[in-house]
Amino acid sequence: MSLMYPSVDELLNKVDSRYKLIALASKRAKELEELPRLKDELLKLKREEKPTDRDKKQIQEIAAQLETLVGPTLDNYKSVKPIGRALEEINAGNVQIDPVNKDKSED
């Protein structure tokens, strides 16, 4: 096994440039970090006995954010860090650049 798993060479077979690889991995790692925090915050707000209008608005906002996030896509990870997990998901082909956003960025 190489020093880094997955290797950059393996990853570049999935994404056509180092820049895109870094952008995709960092975005996915942020999502993986954000998901548990948002879930905890939502549960905390829902446990309030008398939620205020502000609490209700926050619940709606968090629920909307959670709808856009995808949870972990692999059953087992070798890495414990979000960036390593993101790279593993990219290598498995579970995370790809959104073609709609890709077209916009190339204009």
Curated annotation (Swiss-Prot):
Keywords: DNA-directed RNA polymerase, Nucleotidyltransferase, Transcription, Transferase. GO terms for biological process: DNA-templated transcription. It comes from the Bacteria. Gene3D superfamilies: 3.90.940.10. One of its GO terms (cellular component) is DNA-directed RNA polymerase complex. It catalyses: RNA(n) + a ribonucleoside 5'-triphosphate = RNA(n+1) + diphosphate. It holds the Pfam family RNA_pol_Rpb6. Its EC number is 2.7.7.6. SUPFAM superfamilies: RPB6/omega subunit-like (SSF63562). One of its GO terms (molecular function) is DNA binding. The RNAP catalytic core consists of 2 alpha, 1 beta, 1 beta' and 1 omega subunit. When a sigma factor is associated with the core the holoenzyme is formed, which can initiate transcription. HAMAP family: RNApol_bact_RpoZ (MF_00366). Belongs to the RNA polymerase subunit omega family. Promotes RNA polymerase assembly. Latches the N- and C-terminal regions of the beta' subunit thereby facilitating its interaction with the beta and alpha subunits. This is DNA-directed RNA polymerase subunit omega. It comes from Oenococcus oeni (strain ATCC BAA-331 / PSU-1).
